[in-house]
Amino acid sequence: MTVSAVSSVSDDPATVLVCINVKSAAHPILVGNGRLCINILAGHHEDVARMIAGMTGLAAEERMAQVGWETGDYGQPVLPDALAVLEGDIVLQQQAGTHSVLFVEIRHIRLAASQADGLAYFGRRFHRIAAEVALAA
């Protein structure tokens, strides 16, 4: 699945929040598992994002099978060339209207070896976010 809301909460312990619609088929799976992995997508992952979000008409099982997932250090599905991978435990769940807010304590972080553009979803469209390159003076 893809989510449109991920935010940092705390740096000690490293915690982020993820918002997920309670009607999502993934909701009971994530909550029941108690763990999740956040794959931060690169600009070239728009097709992957569309597929995992269900925008292509494929069934959930087919969507997952189409991506070359690896098993991360914490046992969750990881996109091998993601910009960053955050694996962690759901330590708190709060209901807020149509969504659950899942607080995830990060147990493992993996960063890509090279810098690339990021991918964001805004205004019902995907957008590439240019990677900034720091130039030495």
Q: Model regions: which residues?
A:
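Basic, polyanion-binding surface patches
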Residues: 1-137
